[in-house]
Every structure is written in structure tokens, then in C-alpha cells.
Curated annotation (Swiss-Prot):
Organism: Arabidopsis thaliana (Mouse-ear cress)
Region (Disordered): 120-149, 203-224, 284-304, 322-369
Extent of Polar residues compositional bias: 284-297
Keyword Transcription: yes
Main location: nucleus
Residues reported to bind Zn(2+): 82, 85, 107, 110
Name of protein: Dof zinc finger protein DOF2.5
Record function comment: Transcription factor specifically involved in the maternal control of seed germination. Regulates transcription by binding to a 5'-AA[AG]G-3' consensus core sequence. May ensure the activation of a component that would trigger germination as a consequence of red light perception.
UniProt keyword annotations, A-Z: DNA-binding, Germination, Metal-binding, Nucleus, Transcription, Transcription regulation, Zinc, Zinc-finger
Length: 369
């Protein structure tokens, strides 16, 4: 190949000619082949114009470029307004788009997705911002601060007896639930002993005679001027005056329990001493059967008062029952004495009569007949 032909071919290549023209040499030997190979292939373009092979390749390249541009133009380059907040701070979702027919968009203002031709997602993506969290926590703390001021105090301070005395009489119309004084006995003999351990003395009729105490607090019951303790009510059987409306005798009356004879333990509660001594002259242990001597009956009588304690709380009913029993026993004893001729020196009588006369004698000594 000559140098001139080489330079011409290089210039033609620089002018970017079609491959068919570059591959075809200018000699006569290849002309018949070129005529057969260089058929004018007519191709219809998008515009409907038929072109030859030389122009078809250029048009096809241009069509490819226009197709890429058309695809890029199909994607929205401009920012759309959010259908919820109408803001332009939106973006097209390239990666999490599920279908090209309904492209997906995202609003950065309200943090919501929406699709073109679809519905708006109402739930925001992610959480709220940190600024909103701080504001919500501060509002909740303000609510907690305002709630205790509106609610009543469920734990009022405990008022002792020295604070109750300072109150006026008009303000002491409550139920007097704090009438158990704790540190009120500075004026009494025992400084550290509570007042409810010092019981008032009882009279025979069962009414309460209160101690002389400097107290201005009125009790629940109208007749008492000092605080009434629970132990005091149990002892007296709630036998207060009739105007108070309480006349119950479920506990022993004052004649059966005297404050001078009641023994108190260290805890302040009375020991169960003889609340109701029995009027019968025989013991319930059935000791000493058949012995009718006066010494034996006196020993049984003393033994009964030391050991046989009747601890029934129903004082008045037991008193009436015991008195009726002794009257019946005395009546039977008198009939037996009359039937036997009132023979007090007869020691050879039947053991049954001697037993009953010795046991049911009211004097305690008994008579042997």
C-alpha cells in the first residue's frame, strides 16, 4: 500500500466515515464485490422517512440518545408539592419504588410517603424529632407538679393530746378518734404511763365517776368530760347516762369490778381476777365427798375462792342465775331439815343427806345431821 493511500485512508477515518466505506478499498478488483455488498438497505425511521445505509446508522445512534433523554424526562425532575402539607421539600424515591406506573414520593416536611395515583400514608416514617420529645417530657413534668396540689392530703399529721387541748371547744365536735392520749400524763403520778391505763373508779350503780383531769376536749358521749378509752368502755360495760342513748350491760358492772382490786400487767391490760365469784359453797372439783365436818366445808369454800374462778363476761345474768340457784338450794335444804326433825346432832343419818346439807349450806360451815 502506498503512503499516499495510507494518508488518505487515515484522513477518512478521522472524518468518521461509516464502516462500509472504510472497509471498501479503491482498487478495481473489489468493485464487483462492493456492488453486490453495497445494497441500499432502506430502513424506516421514526419519522417515516426511508434512508440509505449511510444515513441509517447515524439516525439509529441519534434515536438511542433521544430514547435515553426521553427516559430521563419521564422521571420528574421538578419537585412536586406534598398533598398533605403542600411543601416543595419532596423527593422521588429511586430505590424503594415498587412500580413504575405509580412512582413513589417522599415529603421531608411531614415525613410521609405518597404514590402518584395512590393514597397518602398517614403514619410518619421513623419517630418524632428530639425537640418534640423534650417538649413532651417537660409538659408531663408540669402535669405531675400540678396534680398533687389539687389532690387532698391523704396522710394528715397526727395530733396528740397536748395539741388537742389547745383547740377550742367549738372545733372539738368530731368523733374524737384521737382521744387515746399518748403523752398527756405530766400532771399525774406516772409520767410515762398512758392515760388509758389509769382507770376511773366505779360506783355500785355502774355509772362512771371520772377522775379530776384538766381536759377541755369533749368525748363522744355527752356525760363524760375526759377522753374515753376502749379499755374503760369494756370495763364499765358502756353504762353511761341515759341521755347519751347507750345503756348496754354486756360486761360486768362496777360492783363486780373495782379499780382498787384490778391488777394491771406491764402492757396495761387488767389480769383476769375474780370478775364473778360464785355464791355456791361447794367447789366444782367434787373433792371431799362424804365429809361433813365444818373444817372440811370451810376448806372447800376457801379452795373455791382460790381456784374456781368463773370468768363469764355476762355479769348481771350470771348474778341472777346464781342467786336463783342458791334460793332453790336453801328451800330444799329447809324442807330436808323439817322432814328429819331438825336433828343437828344425828351423825348416823344417810350419807346423801349429810352430803347435800354440807354442800348447800349458805353459811359455808354447814350443819351435820
Amino acid at each position: 500500500m502506498d503512503a499516499t493511500k495510507w494518508t488518505q485512508g487515515f484522513q477518512e477515518m478521522m472524518n468518521v466515515k461509516p464502516m462500509e466505506q472504510i472497509m471498501i478499498p479503491n482498487n478495481n478488483t473489489h468493485q464487483p464485490n462492493t456492488t453486490s455488498n453495497a445494497r441500499p438497505n432502506t430502513i424506516l425511521t421514526s419519522n417515516g422517512v426511508s434512508t440509505a445505509g449511510a444515513t441509517v446508522s447515524g439516525v439509529s445512534n441519534n434515536n438511542n440518545n433521544t430514547a435515553v433523554v426521553a427516559e430521563r424526562k419521564a422521571r420528574p425532575q421538578e419537585k412536586l408539592n406534598c398533598p398533605r402539607c403542600n411543601s416543595t421539600n419532596t423527593k422521588f424515591c429511586y430505590y424503594n419504588n415498587y412500580s413504575l406506573t405509580q412512582p413513589r414520593y417522599f415529603c421531608k416536611g411531614c415525613r410521609r410517603y405518597w404514590t402518584e395515583g395512590g393514597s397518602l400514608r398517614n403514619v410518619p416514617v421513623g419517630g418524632s424529632s428530639r425537640k418534640n420529645k423534650r417538649s413532651s417530657s417537660s409538659s408531663s413534668s408540669n402535669i405531675l407538679q400540678t396534680i398533687p396540689s389539687s389532690l387532698p392530703d391523704l396522710n394528715p399529721p397526727i395530733l396528740f393530746s397536748n395539741q388537742i387541748h389547745n383547740k377550742s371547744k367549738g372545733s372539738s365536735q368530731d368523733l374524737n378518734l384521737l382521744s387515746f392520749p399518748v403523752m398527756q400524763d405530766q400532771h399525774h403520778h406516772h409520767v410515762h404511763m398512758s392515760q388509758f391505763l389509769q382507770m376511773p373508779k366505779m360506783e355500785g350503780n355502774g355509772n362512771i365517776t371520772h377522775q379530776q383531769q384538766p381536759s377541755s376536749s369533749s368525748s363522744v358521749y355527752g356525760s363524760s368530760s375526759s377522753p374515753v378509752s376502749a379499755l374503760e368502755l369494756l370495763r364499765t360495760g358502756v353504762n353511761v347516762s341515759s341521755r347519751s342513748g347507750i345503756n348496754s350491760s354486756f360486761m360486768p358492772s362496777g360492783s363486780m369490778m373495782d379499780s382498787n382490786t384490778v391488777l394491771y400487767t406491764s402492757s396495761g391490760f387488767p389480769t383476769m381476777v375474780d370478775y364473778k365469784p360464785s355464791n355456791l359453797s361447794f367447789s366444782t372439783d367434787h373433792q371431799g365427798l362424804g365429809h361433813n365436818s365444818n373444817n372440811r366445808s370451810e376448806a372447800l369454800h376457801s379452795d373455791h375462792h382460790q381456784q374456781g374462778r368463773v370468768l363469764f363476761p355476762f355479769g348481771d345474768q350470771m348474778k341472777e342465775l346464781s342467786s336463783s340457784i342458791t334460793q332453790e338450794v336453801d328451800h330444799d335444804d329447809n324442807q330436808q331439815q323439817k322432814s328429819h326433825g331438825n336433828n343437828n346432832n344425828n351423825n348416823n343419818s344417810s350419807p346423801n343427806n349429810g352430803y347435800w346439807s354440807g354442800m348447800f349450806s349458805t353459811t359455808g360451815g354447814g350443819s351435820s345431821w
